Amino acid sequence: MSIRIIPQDQLEKSDKRTAEVIPPLLFPRLKNLYNRRAARLRELAENNPLGDYLRFAALIAHAQEVVLYDHPLEMDLTARIKAAAEQGKPPLDIHVLPRDGHWQKLLQSLIAELKPEMSGPALAVIENLEKASAQELETMASALFSADFSAVSSDKAPFIWAALSLYWAQMASLIPGKARAEYGEARQFCPVCGSIPVSSMVHIGSSQGLRYLHCNLCETEWHVVRVKCSNCEQTRDLHYWSLESEQAAIKAESCGDCGTYLKILYQEKDPNVEPVADDLASLVLDARMEQEGFARSSINPFLFPGEGE
């Protein structure tokens, strides 16, 4: 089951209803998204062995909030959505969509916002990025989108991704089309940009009990039914792991068929869970899953694989 985005001018022509009982897509609501993430990271940093890194990630998230409002994006995506629908591709496909200079402007603004807060190695990293040429930055961005993580040091990647993510999230929030679920493949990829999830969340409220995967780039969420592997869509050999009780707010769903796992966050157990922050703060669970022989099917935007990983 994949999700296709239908342009506005095609909705009335469609012979299928698009107002499903279950919303297939939840486009990013950028107001307070980054502030909420930063606050959650700071909260989780208390009594966490990774506290220093969580506070570091909170600084980046807060900078994203500031830069978001300093550099709003105005763009008409109507033609892009129509062309992508005709090609059967995500409208903001990371492998196809040309990047303009806006994302590099966001990066430089993030660096300016973060420099007073950084010291030591972290300061050296962002000063190095500040001096990089536009082509060097584009090369690193392309490498990250191609999952060529050996080409970008793991200390630079979070800063570059923070700018790219902000750019893609701004675009995703402007999409004028609507979404509808249609049969197909590749449900493990974001239907808006083609990136991968950071984690999944079982919602409360209007989408009570529904699971949505959260994109690690454009912040869109897309529906995937529960008790199905989000990577290979098999249901035969799924298991759920937690470091606490069966009522834990964070679990890992493992699949014996493809050998991967993805974390599931339960708002019913903790309404404050946040897909990026809580994933990053629960790396002990990742270590346990690695011991059990499972590979992570997602990437956290604050933690990229290093060379050889």
Swiss-Prot record:
Belongs to the FdhE family. One of its GO terms (biological process) is protein maturation. The keyword Cytoplasm applies. Keywords: Cytoplasm. It is found in: Cytoplasm. Its main location: cytoplasm. This is Protein FdhE homolog. The keyword Transcription does not apply. One of its GO terms (molecular function) is ferric iron binding. GO terms for cellular component: cytosol. Necessary for formate dehydrogenase activity. InterPro entries: FdhE-like_sf, FdhE_C, FdhE_central, FdhE_N, Formate_DH_accessory.
